[in-house]
From Swiss-Prot:
The keyword Membrane applies. Belongs to the Mediator complex subunit 25 family. PTOV1 subfamily. May activate transcription. Required for nuclear translocation of FLOT1. Promotes cell proliferation. Residues 12-21 have a biased composition (Gly residues). It comes from Rattus norvegicus (Rat). May interact with CREBBP. Interacts with FLOT1. This is Prostate tumor-overexpressed gene 1 protein homolog. Disulfide bonds: none annotated.
Amino acid sequence: MVRPRRAPHRSGAGGPLGGRGRPPRPLVVRAVRSRSWPAGPRGPQPPRIRARSAPPMEGARVFGALGPIGPSSPGLTLGGLAVNEHRLSNKLLAWSGVLEWQEKRRPFSDSAAKLKRTLPCQAYVNQGENLETDQWPQKLIMQLIPQQLLTTLGPLFRNSQLAQFHFTNRDCDSLKGLCRIMGNGFAGCMLFPHISPCEVRVLMLLYSSKKKIFMGLIPYDQSGFVNAIRQVITTRKQAVGPGGVHSGPVQIVNNKFLAWSGVMEWQEPRPEPNSRSKRWLPSHVYVNQGEILRTDQWPRRLFMQLIPQQLLTTLVPLFRNSRLVQFHFTKDMETLKSLCRIMDNGFAGCVHFSYKASCEVRVLMLLYSSEKKIFIGLIPHDQSNFVNGIRRVIANQQQVLQRSLEQEQQQRGMGG
């Protein structure tokens, strides 16, 4: 239930505008207009995002992946984000309109199709704060983004205004669907249209499944945040690739976050002497939630060389300081089974990055666990020494490698 828009302020220093001994001054809230463009030209306007009675985001913080944003205080967790509990009873209505977003259809349905959802919604602010919304559009378009993608935007969250969003409970299915998606670690990004004359260009929406509330964060550095969020969205689209590996939210497998998608290519020995066949598989790299693996400069195709694991014993010290990622391969099951069989027989994959690639990673090692049925990638932090070490190993043990490959060929020939 929404309380009246205004409530009497207590006089004295505790009032919203301060000033001991002054009579209480009523807080004027602009009426919500039915149009998003002003009727006529107006003079110079003050900043439309400002807090009168408190510094930005006082009593609120964003922690975890996004880092601290304000004074530490008890809050509610929003999948790595936290803000203080807010109740509508002490808030003032600042905006009313409609929120629209697209929701991925249920599994086993057309993956390319999405459901368009809309809900009437209202934005509320604390008493004593002012949020100019008279030029906001009456419909806001929201894009759902995994919160892990926002880890690099922590500094831009440190200076934001909070607003609480409330949705009219007319469409229970849409509201439940939105709560379910955002409760599973997604944030809403509302990009305001350029034709809108308001100064707000972007607003982030978060949801707490524990407190059942939606909180909006409006960064004061709108220009910097818009550029940053566009880069995040572009990087995500590049990772997904043409046509998309998935529709809607980024894939999460076993609580891991998709960091890269592309193609892995390698050559495996054939039963015929001195012959090999080229193989490739669509592949994806996952990292733990909250971790960042910069893959925007990774090539779309990685080339892997199969090496007997016994050749790598001298490189064990360099493996001790490596980052672990998980590889996942899709589509061609026969090719995948063949790769699993080879690597289960004592081979490791050495993935060399092209020198044309501008990323810092030059080599990573791929290992396979037949017990857990997973591929683990090791990215040594000391890339330079590892590259030199793997080259020496290959150069000095070429004969051993050749014998191992021939033995594998014989085993495959006997098995066929």
